[in-house]
């Protein structure tokens, strides 16, 4: 359902809330915030949110501040954390099994959420999927770090991403093609929980779940490199499958399904057909109207 809520900051947040039938007060379900990229809205992530709900995970696709139905204020990452706070307060959500996934700028929100939580925030996530943007590899002094602690983290880095994974700032030279990202020091450090890549001899195995015990919990790291471009992520059944499968495994989805078991792409297809049908109707309506006395003189 479409929602609009006022956050603790006094701002309006718009969103699409997907609640599976299995989520009840007696049997609270895991939940995840789904965050769109820059210049997009919550609807662009509806396929991912819907597939999470089909697996028994409560999903909230938000409009970031400055987008869609949310308050038109300067962009900041607190909107994603506000979304987590909203989910944690729902009686049918298990606040100990929260996750987040985001694409592009939404992926940066995932990293920001961990920073908010580590600074004493009231809620935290157990798992996240970062897509279409680099995670944090180093601290401000350049030291390699595990910025995500014991949280499970999956990264989806498109081989032909036109914005990220080249090892440079937005205005600087590229140090590698995105398709070669898995062989970089950054990727090696990510899957090895922030270890200095100079000490890592093995190459990164794409699709392998790396595990390490941190703070008494087995944390996971996973890297996927699908053959696609940056913007295709929100429509790609492949990326959607990677996202929902990781979250369903990490959060313990009540109704696990295979990665290819999806309806989201079918929904997008019929939405496109509906758009075509609307234009066909408009053209037909014009032809009908010009045959009436009122418009015959045109």
What is each of the regions a protein language model found here?
Residues 262-298:
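Core alpha-helical transmembrane segments of integral membrane proteins
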Residues 2-263:
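Soluble extramembrane regions of membrane proteins in the secretory/endomembrane system
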């Amino acid at each position: 359902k479409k929602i609009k809520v006022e956050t603790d900051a006094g701002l309006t947040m718009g969103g699409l809330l997907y609640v599976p039938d299995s989520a009840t007060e007696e049997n609270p379900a895991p939940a995840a915030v789904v965050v769109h990229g820059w210049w997009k809205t919550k609807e662009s992530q509806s396929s991912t949110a819907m597939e999470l709900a089909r697996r028994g995970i409560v999903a909230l696709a938000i409009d970031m501040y400055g987008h869609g139905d949310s308050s038109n204020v300067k962009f900041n990452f607190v909107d994603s954390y506000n979304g987590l706070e909203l989910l944690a307060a729902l009686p049918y959500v298990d606040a100990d099994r929260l996750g987040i996934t985001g694409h592009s700028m939404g992926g940066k929100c995932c990293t920001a959420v961990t920073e908010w939580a580590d600074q004493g925030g009231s809620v935290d996530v157990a798992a996240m999927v970062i897509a279409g943007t680099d995670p944090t590899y180093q601290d401000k002094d350049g030291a390699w770090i595990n910025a995500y602690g014991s949280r499970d983290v999956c990264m989806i880095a498109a081989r032909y991403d036109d914005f990220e994974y080249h090892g440079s700032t937005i205005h600087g030279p590229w140090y590698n093609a995105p398709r070669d990202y898995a062989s970089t020091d950054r990727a090696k450090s990510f899957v090895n929980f922030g270890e200095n890549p100079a000490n890592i001899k093995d190459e990164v195995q794409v699709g392998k779940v790396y595990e390490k015990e941190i703070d008494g919990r087995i944390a996971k790291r996973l890297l996927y490199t699908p053959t696609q471009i940056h913007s295709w992520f929100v429509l790609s059944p492949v990326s959607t499958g990677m996202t929902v499968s990781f979250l369903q495994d990490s959060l313990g989805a009540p109704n696990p399904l295979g990665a290819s078991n999806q309806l989201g792409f079918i929904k997008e297809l019929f939405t496109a057909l509906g758009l075509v049908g609307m234009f066909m109707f408009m053209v037909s309506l014009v032809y009908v109207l010009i045959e009436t006395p009122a418009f015959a003189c045109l």
